[in-house]
Structures are given as structure tokens and as C-alpha cells.
């Protein structure tokens, strides 16, 4: 790993300890930053300037910023973009090994008691860190995930992540292992602030997983007894782009299925937990087949579309699969038009 710059942001007086409550004082380091912001970067030269501006606009200022270049092919352009910030960030470079390794590099180099993850194309609102830290100390939790609005390459512009993709996510109280398993989508990594110690204790991100390593970590944290909470306040903007870290719905379901398969095969599960995992795997396979059906329909492949929708319907019968199969039969062109809309 190449430390091109190891200069960290200067710690500022006046961190909002009082706003977080008297019990929070022990979490504010005297010899280092309270929060380490970890930003993995791969092919984001055109986005990183805006992202860093959102970081340096934070009302909470007791932080350091670690930017980890994951062997990006646009490194020359990327380094030009971050050059104005080199005296305010710690810049780490590594060979391309994936987001999990990049985030772990940041975690191992971090000096803060808390870590905040941020993808290099997402944006925080100015009060993001202040609100997240206040929530953690008021609730006594180990991890909090805030809500986000979509922007970029999406038809869900200005809608929120949790309302769109996590309707079953609890609005209050701690998130249990089974609730996290049952949610249709994982926490937003760019919306997570957490105590660093529990993450180190459960073994960081699984570097064997090229994708969905964030979901895997949240599940291990919940299973270990760490307290995870949702904050329904919209505190960030979640960029949608086809080649981003998040990817499309088909790949998202495929990635998360690998995590649930890992859980079923390697966790010492209770009968209740095993039953729930089996149910979730079946439902996720249904969601994957439904998204594949939409993809085939958008491409005009009526046969493959019908077969995928039929498999989804067999795994979990819903009104959506019924309507999709009906449209495939009576009006494939209308189905194609509907499925061609970007979600």
C-alpha cells in the first residue's frame, strides 16, 4: 500500500459533545479524531470532488478523511481531482482488490473511535455527521443507518431509499438479526456510522466476497450482539449509476443470495433462524427471477421473460408476477415499454 499523503484534517475545537449529551464525552478522543471517514474509490474521478465538498461542509468537524484508491484505471484524473484536498485527507493506494479490501485498509488505518463509510459518488447533507453522532449517543447504539434520497440515473429521483426499497424496515428500536435478514435490501453503506471496535471484533469486511460484503458485515454485527438502528431522517443523497458500487437489481439480488447461502452453510443457526433463512433465500430467488423477467422483457425476449416470470411465480406467487405473465401473453409490447423504464 502506498501512502501518497498521510496528512489528516486538523481537529477543530467545538465538537458538538454537548448536543450529544454528557454520556457521550468518553467517546470523543483527545489524541485523535472522533470519526474516521472511509471513502473507497474506483472509477469515480468525475464524482470525487463533489463528494469531498459534501464532507468538508459538515457541521460536525471532529473527523479525519481516508480516501482509498482501489487500483482505479482513472488514477491520473482522480489524483488531479483530489489534489486540492491532499492537505486535508489521508490518501491510500492499493492494487485493485475490491471495495471490501479498500474499506478494510481504511479501517486498519483509522484512528477514530467511530467510522463513517461513504461511497465516492454519494453526497452527505451538511448535518449528516452531527445528526448521526447525536443519534448514536442518545440511543446508545453501535451502528446507525440514515435514510437517503435517490439521484442520478434513476426514475426514483427524490424518493427515499427506505420508503422505496425497505418498506418492512423498522422505523424505531434496534434492528435484530432476523429483521435484518428479512429486509428486502441491505442498509445504505454511505449512510452508516458505527463504533469501530465491534467491527474489528467481528473480523471487518469479508475479503472473499467481492460484492455484498456490507450486508455480510451488518449481519455478523447483529448476530454478535451489537446494537444496530435505523434513523429515518434523510441525511444523504444516494447516486444511482449503472457502473457504481451498488449495481443493478439483478446483480444486487445475486450478490445478496451469496451472503444468505454463506449464512445457511456456515452459521450455527437455531431452528427459527434456519427456517427464516430458507424462506428468505426462496424469496430472494423469486425477486431475482422477477428482475430477470423484466430485463428479458425490456430486451424484447418474450420467451426468456415468460420463463423467468413463471419461475418467480412458482417460488412466490404475487400479483406482480401474475400481471407480468398476463401482459407477456396479451400485450408483450406494453410489458416491454413498462420494463424499459429505469427503476
Where are these regions (language model features)?
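Glycine-rich, basic loop-to-helix element that forms the pyrophosphate-binding segment
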Residues: 77, 94-110, 131
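Conserved nucleotide-sugar donor-binding catalytic segment
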Residues: 108, 168-257
Amino acid at each position: 500500500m502506498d501512502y501518497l499523503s498521510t496528512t489528516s484534517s486538523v481537529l477543530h475545537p467545538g465538537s458538538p459533545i454537548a448536543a450529544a449529551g454528557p454520556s457521550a464525552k468518553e467517546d470523543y478522543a483527545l489524541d485523535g479524531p472522533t470519526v474516521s471517514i472511509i471513502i473507497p474509490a474506483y472509477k469515480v474521478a468525475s464524482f470525487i470532488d463533489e463528494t469531498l465538498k459534501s464532507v468538508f461542509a459538515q457541521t460536525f468537524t471532529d473527523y479525519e478523511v481516508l480516501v482509498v484508491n482501489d487500483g482505479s484505471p482513472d488514477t491520473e484524473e482522480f489524483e488531479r481531482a483530489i489534489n486540492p484536498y491532499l492537505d486535508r485527507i489521508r490518501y491510500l493506494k492499493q492494487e485493485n482488490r475490491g471495495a471490501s479490501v479498500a474499506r478494510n485498509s481504511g479501517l486498519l488505518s483509522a484512528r477514530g473511535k467511530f467510522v463513517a463509510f461513504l461511497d465516492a459518488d454519494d453526497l452527505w447533507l451538511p448535518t449528516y455527521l452531527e445528526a448521526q453522532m447525536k443519534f448514536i449517543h442518545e440511543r446508545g447504539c453501535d451502528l446507525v443507518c440514515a435514510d437517503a434520497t435517490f439521484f442520478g440515473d434513476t426514475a426514483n429521483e427524490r424518493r427515499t431509499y427506505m420508503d422505496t426499497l425497505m418498506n418492512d424496515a423498522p422505523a424505531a428500536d434496534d434492528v435484530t438479526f432476523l429483521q435484518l435478514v428479512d429486509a428486502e435490501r441491505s442498509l445504505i453503506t454511505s449512510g452508516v456510522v458505527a463504533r469501530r471496535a465491534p467491527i474489528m471484533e467481528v473480523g471487518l469486511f469479508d475479503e472473499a466476497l467481492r460484492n455484498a460484503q456490507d450486508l455480510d458485515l451488518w449481519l455478523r454485527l447483529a448476530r454478535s450482539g451489537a446494537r444496530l438502528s435505523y434513523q429515518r431522517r434523510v441525511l444523504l443523497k444516494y447516486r444511482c449509476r449503472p457502473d457504481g458500487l451498488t449495481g443493478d437489481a439483478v446483480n444486487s439480488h445475486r450478490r445478496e443470495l451469496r451472503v444468505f447461502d454463506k449464512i445457511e452453510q456456515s452459521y450455527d443457526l437455531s431452528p427459527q433462524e434456519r427456517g427464516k433463512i430458507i424462506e428468505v433465500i426462496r424469496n430472494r430467488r423469486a425477486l431475482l427471477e422477477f428482475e430477470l423477467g423484466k430485463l428479458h422483457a425490456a430486451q424484447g425476449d418474450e420467451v426468456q421473460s415468460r420463463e423467468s416470470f413463471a419461475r418467480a411465480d412458482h417460488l412466490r406467487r404475487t400479483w406482480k408476477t401474475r400481471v407480468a405473465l398476463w401482459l407477456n401473453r396479451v400485450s408483450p409490447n406494453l410489458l416491454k415499454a413498462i420494463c424499459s423504464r429505469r427503476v
